[in-house]
């Protein structure tokens, strides 16, 4: 059976941890940050875990767990 192809757009946006969790970046980081508090801006910089309902779809996009 041929190798499965990794969707490169998904590989740039998600990464898989050593324990198998799929992590993503949070949105709202690029602009319109001035009216947000420093605490909220720091929270946007953290990585977030992908929701369980989306996990199976993303695993199909990155079958080899590209990090």
UniProtKB/Swiss-Prot annotation:
It comes from the Bacteria. One of its GO terms (cellular component) is cytosolic large ribosomal subunit. GO terms for molecular function: structural constituent of ribosome. It holds the Pfam family Ribosomal_L35p. One of its GO terms (biological process) is translation. InterPro entries: Ribosomal_bL35 (IPR001706), Ribosomal_bL35-like (IPR021137), Ribosomal_bL35_sf (IPR037229). Keywords: Ribonucleoprotein, Ribosomal protein. NCBIfam families: rpmI_bact (TIGR00001). Belongs to the bacterial ribosomal protein bL35 family. This is Large ribosomal subunit protein bL35. It comes from Dehalococcoides mccartyi (strain ATCC BAA-2266 / KCTC 15142 / 195) (Dehalococcoides ethenogenes (strain 195)). The gene is rpmI.
